[in-house]
Amino acid sequence: VLAEPMGRNTAPAIGLAAFILQRTNPEAVIGLFPSDHVIANPDRFREVLADGIQIAASGENIVVLGVHPTRPETGYGYIEAGSLASGDALRVRRFTEKPNAETAAEFLKAGNYYWNSGMFLWSARTLAGALTEHLPKTAAVLEKIAADYDTKKFPATFRRLYPKCENISIDYAVLEPRSAKGEEESNIFCLRADFGWNDLGSWTALHEHHATKQSPADGNLISGQGIFTLNASRNYVHA
């Protein structure tokens, strides 16, 4: 476990792992998985990951897991899917970060947009190369830090140099500029995250996670004993 001396968003964090791994195993496939997600079907999740690892391991490919949207959500980024590449993999046309409500509604209606789950697969070499191309100053810093890994100098080097990294997400640093090359050139592929995904980052998401076909018509979800509702709808009550 590498604990950052300070938060610099996702690009430096995952980038450092890539530069460290590249020194010993450049073809190692790295997975990025946020910790606040719920996966309802772990077996299907593992199947999708196995497919994604194969794609990420063959060439300079980046794999993103996309979730079929169920509402015009403005709190998630979106993936515009293009042509079918092979198997279940779709080529990615572009990424859009957290659109306004009108744009999100247009994406939902279009039918070829997916929520960006924030889960990615790529080889250490591919990610290190992408950072060097699109975020060269930060990549140079990360490479210097990685050079001292497994030495006594590493903790001091890490603390001294890491704050020099740009504070930027992997989406803005790599995915958006890379997708701008076009779906045939970017080598970014989307696999459908059809394994019961939910990001518990909002009350709406929490409500959806606990809702079932047997949920009451008023939309109230109640967890606990002795709880009664009056003239209330679409509430989540836990006591």
Predicted regions and their residues:
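Conserved beta-loop-beta/alpha segment of the NTase-like Rossmann-fold superfamily
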Residues: V1-L84, G129-L135
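Short coil/turn connectors at secondary-structure junctions
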Residues: N25-A28, S58-I62, T74, G87-V92, ...
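A residue-level structural signature of the nucleotidyltransferase/glycosyltransferase Rossmann-like core
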Residues: I30, N112, M119-F120, N167, ...
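Flexible, glycine/proline-enriched loop segments at strand-loop-helix junctions
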Residues: D36-D43, A89-F95, Y113-G118, R160-L161
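A short, charged helix-loop
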Residues: A81-Y114
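A conserved mid-domain beta-alpha-beta active-site/ligand-binding segment of alpha/beta enzyme cores
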Residues: L108, Y113-L121, L131
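Left-handed beta-helix
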Residues: A124-A239
